[in-house]
A protein has these predicted regions:
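N-terminal membrane topogenic signal
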Residues: 3-12, 337
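Membrane-interface helix-boundary signature
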Residues: 4-8, 288-298, 377-378, 426
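Hydrophobic membrane-insertion alpha-helices, especially the h-region
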Residues: 10-24, 306
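Hydrophobic alpha-helical transmembrane segments in integral membrane proteins
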Residues: 23-35, 612-615
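Soluble extramembrane regions of membrane proteins in the secretory/endomembrane system
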Residues: 30-289
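Cytosolic-side membrane-insertion boundary helix
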Residues: 277-307, 317-339
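Alpha-helical transmembrane segments of integral membrane proteins
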Residues: 343-615
Length: 615
């Protein structure tokens, strides 16, 4: 066996072992090493839609020993697994926990009805069906139920006590609205850097909430009074306990904060267990959920890395060998020109991000223009991809007209298979597509094996690699793949590795890493500037967020203020990682096609498999 073949097989085997061990360990942590039974249940609502929910049942819970229970609801664009920090830590302390996927999220069906969400006070996205099911379970103490939710989930949580007044005894709001003053035993986890103005009563500084009339009313205090952070008011015995906890975190990442989880867990103990922890009680600050999150990231990254040895092994075969073409090495812009091109591209991306993404998201115009565009957040991403591709493609056309006079051909930008003429070798291109399909199916099946056997998705703090829960989501994948392919072929292809082609360094390894760093600058620096404008003044003690009162050429950017800057916490690290693989694929094949296919496929898999969709 060839030495390189042996090394690639060894690398693949080691990676699969690491992934398997990480998934099994994550499963063990989730179940507190066998002390909690974890399963996914499916509940059908009155409209016939399926509500998928993750159920945590501690050892000892039975009809003769029913335990208090908590319904744990996720936020917009999230799913049941995002709430794992609360679910895991509650269950290992003696609470039955049910974490549903709201309608249109995760594995649930139905789609989100935005009109009902904002107009019907009884619409809770299927979570009432989940709670009704939970109450009927024999191992649940139906008279001691808690509800909690993050963001949108919190908006649902405050409605449930009115629908189940005899059951719900406690409410925990995680970066959400306070609800009515009549709510039983209310804990508000207030994110210091909450991007959503409504969740901080539109105050420029969260610290000023201590004198908010709305919050004073929610806590049952006099209108002229002042709230003390992390102080409990009222009594658990009569349901008037109130507390507003200050969490030094932004909206999205609040569930990952130790203090958030500790506050919520202890609140449920005080409200649902009369302050007694019982034999399963553990200090609320002693938490294990983060180990599961880290292991999930290892499975996610490890699965992507398996593309390298598999690609190398397939390119060693006679059939796929032609896919590995020599890299073009005739055209290189000088150092100064490269930095100008990269900076211009970065700035264009930074400018287009707020201008285009707001056409998606809640109330975005794209869903109004195209009835088939059901992924609300996906619409904003697609608009960003298309706009960048159009601008970069237009600039490339003008550049190429002049570059041709200097002998540059489409071969030099990784497009043509002939050095002089623009020629596509459809046989090689077909094999390239087949190779990409094999790589994608490998990752999809690998994730599926462990999702089916251990219940573990490959993710960190956000839905990434997971199985498509319906044919509808598969359809979304192919619809939104088109704008992504356009972006990665033009911006992530002919621009990066053609128009802005970089020179080789002393070794292939150094070239890979240096190219990657420069690609990150060219493709991500503009997004980082947007992130910095939104957050840095806020983080450094000023008022925020940065875009809240900004207009751009008479355009109101209020739609952009909250959700889309928040998503940069997801997109910036995601892009940084994906661009490493994009660079590797170009260097390995000498063409832009395989990299564009794989990276757009991954990006849209992450988006379509778990993203919110509309009815």
């Amino acid at each position: 066996m060839d030495g390189n073949v042996r090394k690639n097989w060894l690398m693949l085997i080691i990676l699969v072992v690491i992934i398997a061990v990480s998934a099994v360990l994550a499963d063990q942590i989730e179940s507190d090493f066998g002390k909690v039974e974890v399963s996914v249940v499916e509940i059908v609502d009155l409209d016939g839609y399926t509500i998928a929910a993750k159920l945590f049942v501690p050892d000892g819970a039975s009809a003769s020993n029913p335990m208090p229970a908590v319904v744990n609801m996720h936020g917009y664009q999230n799913d049941k697994n995002v709430q794992d920090p609360f679910s895991i830590e509650l269950a290992r302390r003696g609470f039955v926990v049910l974490a549903p996927d709201s309608l249109g999220h995760g594995d649930s069906g139905g789609g989100l009805n935005t009109a009902a969400w904002f107009g019907d006070p009884t619409y809770v996205m299927g979570n009432e069906t989940a709670l009704a099911w939970l109450i009927k379970q024999p191992y649940v103490d139906a008279a001691n139920i808690g509800v909690m939710g993050h963001s949108m989930g919190g908006m649902n949580a405050v409605k449930l006590p009115g629908l189940f007044p005899d059951n719900v005894k406690a409410v925990v709001q995680q970066a959400s609205s306070p609800g009515s003053p009549e709510l039983p035993n209310l804990l508000m986890l207030q994110a210091r850097y909450d991007e959503f103005g409504g969740f901080r009563e539109n105050q420029p500084r969260t610290e000023e909430l201590t004198s908010s009339e709305t919050r004073l009313a929610a806590l049952g205090l006099e209108a002229e009074g002042s709230i003390e952070w992390d102080t409990t008011y009222g009594s658990f015995a009569d349901g008037t306990a109130r507390r507003m906890a200050f969490i030094n975190m932004d909206h999205h990442l609040l569930p990952l904060k130790n203090k958030s989880v500790a506050e919520a867990v202890d609140w449920m103990r005080l409200a649902l267990k009369d302050g007694e922890g019982g034999s399963m009680w553990i200090d609320p600050t002693k938490q294990i959920f983060m180990f599961k999150e880290i292991l999930g990231f290892i499975t996610l990254l490890g699965t992507m890395v398996t593309m390298l040895p598999i690609t190398n092994l397939l390119l060693k075969t006679k059939f796929f060998a032609p896919v590995a073409q020599p890299m073009p090495n005739r055209h290189f812009p000088d150092k100064g020109t490269w930095w100008k091109l990269a900076t211009l591209n970065a700035l264009i991306g930074g400018i287009l991000y707020p201008l285009t993404t707001q056409y998606g998201g809640i109330g975005g115009k794209i869903e109004q223009w195209f009835s088939w565009a059901k992924l609300e957040m996906g619409n904003g991403v697609a608009a960003f991809f298309v706009a960048n591709a159009v601008v970069a493609g237009t600039l490339f056309i003008f550049w190429y007209r002049n570059a041709k006079k200097e002998g540059v051909t489409m071969y030099d930008v990784g497009v043509s298979f002939d050095e002089e003429k623009t020629k596509i070798d459809w046989g090689i291109l077909g094999k390239t597509v087949l190779l990409g399909v094999i790589l994608f199916l490998w990752m999809y099946l690998l994730e599926g094996i462990f999702q089916w056997t251990t219940g573990q998705e490959f993710r960190f703090a956000w839905p990434y690699m997971r199985q498509f829960s319906s044919g509808q989501r598969v359809g979304f994948f192919f619809i939104y793949l088109i704008p992504a392919l356009l972006f990665f072929l033009i911006n992530g292809g002919i621009f990066l590795y053609g128009q802005a082609r970089m020179k080789e360094y002393e070794t292939p390894a150094k070239t890979q890493w240096m190219w990657w760093l420069k690609v990150v600058y060219a493709m991500v620096a503009g997004l980082f500037l947007i992130w910095a404008f939104q957050y840095l003044p806020w983080f450094l003690g000023g008022a925020g967020p940065g875009f809240e009162t900004i207009t751009f050429f008479q355009m109101d950017l209020s739609q952009f203020t909250s959700m889309w800057p928040l998503m940069l916490f997801v997109y910036i690290p995601e892009f940084i990682i994906l661009f490493w693989f994009l660079t590797w694929f170009f260097r390995r094949t000498g063409k832009i096609y395989l990299g564009a296919l794989m990276i757009s496929g991954l990006a849209i898999w992450f988006l379509a498999a778990g993203s919110i969709y509309l009815m």
